[in-house]
Amino acid sequence: MHNTDVLIIGAGPVGLFAIFQAGMLGMKCHVIDAQEVIGGQCITLYPEKPIYDIPAYPKIAAADLIKQLELQAATFNPVYHLNQQAVELKKEGEFFEVKTSKDIVIKSKVIVIAAGAGSFGPNKPPLANIEEFENESVFYFINNRSKFTGKNIVIAGGGDSAVDWAISLSEIANKIYLVHRRDKFRAANESLRQLKDIAESGKIELVTGYQLDSLEGNNSELQSVIVRDLQNNTRKLNANILLPFFGLKQELGNLVNWDLDIKLHHIEVDPVYYQTNISGIYAIGDVAHYSGKLKLILTGFAEAASSLHHAYGKVFDGNALHFEYSTTKYTQ
């Protein structure tokens, strides 16, 4: 059995920053994550995707952000339990005991759930024989941007991922078709401005009012993507790559059995300290929900700070926390 002050579930960007915040307050951390490496979706799904809304970084690749967060957290020697899930929860007096899928037991006074989307996988389009092209011509995640150099690419979707990747890949691709069933995209205003400018240059063609219909090709090599509009008209897009970005399937695993207040795959928390309906268990980042919630990495960082300042009194038996700025608290 391991004993620690704080158990963090999830080693994505918000979980990593929570380690640092706990360390700044003198609290030791163990961390559980289902992936084989730390970083969450930033590493597993889009390590090369540029992120634009991290303070002091006009633009930073997801993998580089994780590298910096890992370095920052390493100061406080966290213990990682990777490639395993939090399975069982028990309360023993003032302590929680969590058992992992590898039968490791971790005892702590506080739990911080920073599980992001939980266990995740892509929402795949219902296209016949799409499996024949997967990992050769059809990709749901991008972990090596350079492989798309000079390609003709169909990107399907209307959210941030579709728009951001269309913008990013337009720098190296021969041609990009951005397919969306509506004529409006759901993305940041600055991204929409960039998309409009690139579309006007001809590097990206907006194919709106259409949905994916079928694929044509041989031996896992895609030759064209057929799209269909609401009037049943079809159009053939000559492309050798399809990138469908229709979001992720969220699975919270055994967390659903912990008597937490869960609605629509999100954990309800109070909007001040992000504590769940169970005292001593907090939820931060994308997995947490409250009125006015913004799903931003930046928001998760702030939630980590607030929740761990509140948790201090639970870890140290009601002792008052005297607030200090990091410049006086900690010097590298």
From Swiss-Prot:
Keywords: FAD, Flavoprotein, NADP, Oxidoreductase
Note describing how the cofactor binds: Binds 1 FAD per subunit.
Cofactor dependency: FAD
Pfam families, alphabetized: Pyr_redox_2
Catalytic activity: 2 reduced [2Fe-2S]-[ferredoxin] + NADP(+) + H(+) = 2 oxidized [2Fe-2S]-[ferredoxin] + NADPH
InterPro entries: FAD/NAD-bd_sf, FAD/NAD-binding_dom, Fd--NADP_Rdtase_type_2, Ferredoxin-NADP_redctase_2
Positions annotated to bind FAD: 33, 41, 46, 86, 120, 286, 327
Main EC class the enzyme belongs to: oxidoreductase
GO MF, one annotated term: ferredoxin-NADP+ reductase activity
Keyword RNA-binding: no
Protein EC: 1.18.1.2
Subunit-structure text: Homodimer.
Family that this chain belongs to: Belongs to the ferredoxin--NADP reductase type 2 family.
HAMAP family membership: FENR2
Protein name per its UniProtKB record: Ferredoxin--NADP reductase
